[in-house]
């Protein structure tokens, strides 16, 4: 069973194509990657993301497998009306589905909006580290500074005219790549809880 399109059943990360607006984490969190990577139990079921890739997603523009954006749909309907279904299926596997550069203008507008952003560093506080069924992730506490991120996210959503359904802000630390044996589920919970105790109320900077 494959749990996520981003990882295979051997714990190796696969190519996964799309466009996303992210905020990179500036802190060195290599110890988290190592904790998962070298933990005898966690490493049997989870593949850690490289600490250099840790980030918070601000807005998901589009990725393989998601419904097409209006820009992509309109291009297909105008240029390939009789191949619509076939191309929609093709978009789920094809690298970057941008036929005729149909979403370039949208990407430029989003990029411009991001460049106009004036906030400097944003400091967030960790609420908890938890296992949500497919990933180990960090959730953040509600601070007034999140209003800046929410406002930016709303502007990006308005430009795309598409709600991405992302949910709450989080940092993904690793993905599950195989089923957890029943006798080790409690051990997994304990090992994740150790990480939770180490990180709760710690801060990091975007």
Question: Residues of each region from the PLM?
Answer:
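Histidine-dependent nucleotide/RNA phosphoesterase domain, centered on the 2H-phosphoesterase fold
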Residues: 1-206
